[in-house]
Amino acid sequence: MKKDSKGLKYKQRTISVWNEVAPFYHKRWAKNEVGPFGVTKKLLDMSKIKKNNTVLDLACGTGLVTKKLIRKVGSKGHINAIDSSESAIKIAKKWTGDVKNLHFVRADAEKVHFNTKFDSITCQYALFFFPNEQKVLKNMKKMMKENGTITLAVHGKYNVPYFDCILESVKKFIPDYLPKYPEMDRFGTKETFSAAIKNAGFSKIIVKKFVFKYSPGTFSEYWNNYKKHLSKPLKEKFDSLTKFQKANLREMVKDKTLEYTKKDGKIVFPWEVLVLTAKNQ
């Protein structure tokens, strides 16, 4: 019960955060496929989704993958897109427009059920948000056609300095800055990613690694944008630091960014992404 209670609390917190940050996330990242969002094309290529397919976009967010699926499946295909954030779905609906064969559903991925059987399921940058990913994956498997394909993308564990430069430093001042449950980077290697999917009963697993580049601008732009767009729970923790602590933290983060800083003062980060495909057999 303790784990279930922790999972429920985490899910509620995640929904609240995404309802808050979805507009910024869409504008800065998803809408223009910035940095790691360049992986969307790779994910769809690896999915081998065809015209007339029936597809489920799991944790669709603000609709980046969903929007591209419309052309992939054509007018005779069908797309269901689910997410737990009402704010994200609202943006996705507006962005994708009035498409007759596309349906958005606000739902819990552990419990959602469709009478439809899917040829393919896509999930970009969301698996790590599920506190019980096995429950989600097994639920997805039940709704897939035999020999159907699931395709997922996650951030790498070791080569994503955009996050690490700040988070490694912040945790020295605020050890509980991020929730310890679930671990957000637990699928960030080919081995751990494959193992999770295999444990859910999938087979013919293929994982590919891609490295993208992303520039947040100068250090000041990187630092100020991070602070500006913190979700409420993180902002409260960050603001609990003294002025002196914040100044020290800023310098620690700046030191970590130096190896990625070009002569013109702009930071260019590498960003590792893993994409996995597997079969329901």
Where are these regions (language model features)?
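Short glycine-dipeptide loop
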Residues: 52, 75-76, 144-149
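Class I SAM-dependent methyltransferase SAM/SAH-binding core
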Residues: 54-112, 135
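Conserved class I S-adenosyl-L-methionine
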Residues: 2-51, 64-68, 88-91, 95, ...
